């Protein structure tokens, strides 16, 4: 079995300029994902998909490969991760590089470690599912969520759960925005990941942080320090 890790990292991040290579406790943010992928020992190649020369240079420094430059039409705010992964698989196939399994690992997942990737891969192989992705439990019961209408009035999505006890409600999970294992065939079929043909690797909340704002970035640094307390 040949395994490929693809790390998408475009250069045009808006809310945090140069997010993928911004300093994160002394190293570029993307370096954590590259090193974890390499040190996990499960990938034959760790490949960057980027349109940005500086990001490519940083990724090469930390051991990733960059055999192509991503097209600009796959580098805007509307390009999906699935399309980026498909593009990478197809380019590598045209270079006679064929892989059985492909992992999309986000550049913004510094809270992971190599052992998590190894355990997730083992579960993916054991389950024989099309996909396996990182998920985490919602902190609050989603059944008791509400919304505000145009007049800022409160409406529950489902009033029957107003008096329900939290422990009586079904647990709900969300995508952790960290990694996605899949067979090459499944990726190229462009099948929807959030279906019964997928399985999940549940992460504790202290390993999950969606880095979209400067506040998110600073919170991720705090989590990293807490998780690696002995190193600081």
UniProtKB/Swiss-Prot annotation:
Top-level EC class: transferase
E.C. no: 2.7.7.81
Keyword flag Transferase: yes
UniProt keywords, alphabetically: Magnesium, Metal-binding, Nucleotidyltransferase, Transferase
SUPFAM superfamilies given in the database record: Nucleotide-diphospho-sugar transferases
Reactions catalysed according to its record: pseudaminate + CTP = CMP-pseudaminate + diphosphate
Classification via InterPro entries: CMP-NeuNAc_synthase (IPR050793), Cytidylyl_trans (IPR003329), Nucleotide-diphossugar_trans (IPR029044), PseF (IPR020039)
Single annotated GO MF: N-acylneuraminate cytidylyltransferase activity
Cofactor list: Mg(2+)
Keyword field contains Magnesium: yes
Pfam families assigned to the protein according to its UniProt record, in alphabetical order: CTP_transf_3 (PF02348)
NCBIfam families: PseF
Protein function: Catalyzes the final step in the biosynthesis of pseudaminic acid, a sialic-acid-like sugar that is used to modify flagellin. Mediates the activation of pseudaminic acid with CMP by forming CMP-pseudaminic acid.
Family classification: Belongs to the CMP-NeuNAc synthase family.
Protein name per Swiss-Prot or TrEMBL: Pseudaminic acid cytidylyltransferase
Organism: Campylobacter jejuni subsp. jejuni serotype O:2 (strain ATCC 700819 / NCTC 11168)
């Amino acid at each position: 079995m040949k395994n490929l890790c693809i790390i998408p990292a475009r250069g045009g991040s808006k809310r945090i300029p140069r997010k993928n290579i911004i300093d994160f406790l002394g190293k570029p943010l993307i370096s954590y994902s590259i090193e974890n992928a390499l040190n996990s020992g499960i990938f034959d190649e760790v490949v960057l998909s980027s349109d940005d020369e500086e990001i490519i240079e940083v990724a090469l420094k930390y051991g990733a490969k960059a055999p192509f430059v991503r097209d600009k039409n796959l580098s805007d705010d509307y390009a999906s991760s699935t399309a980026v992964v498909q593009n990478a698989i197809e380019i590598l196939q045209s270079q006679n590089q064929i892989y059985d399994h492909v992992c999309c690992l986000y550049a913004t997942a510094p809270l992971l470690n190599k052992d998590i990737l190894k355990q997730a891969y083992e579960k993916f192989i054991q389950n024989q599912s099309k996909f396996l992705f990182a998920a985490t439990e919602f902190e609050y019961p989603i059944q008791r969520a509400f919304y505000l209408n145009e007049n800022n009035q409160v409406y529950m999505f489902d009033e029957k759960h107003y008096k329900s006890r939290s422990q009586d409600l079904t647990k709900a999970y969300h995508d952790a925005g960290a990694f996605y294992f899949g067979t090459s065939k499944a990726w190229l079929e462009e099948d929807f990941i959030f279906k019964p043909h997928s399985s999940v690797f549940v992460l504790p909340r202290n390993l999950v942080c969606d880095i979209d704002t400067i506040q998110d970035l600073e919170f991720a640094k705090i989590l990293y320090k807490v998780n690696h307390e002995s190193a600081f």
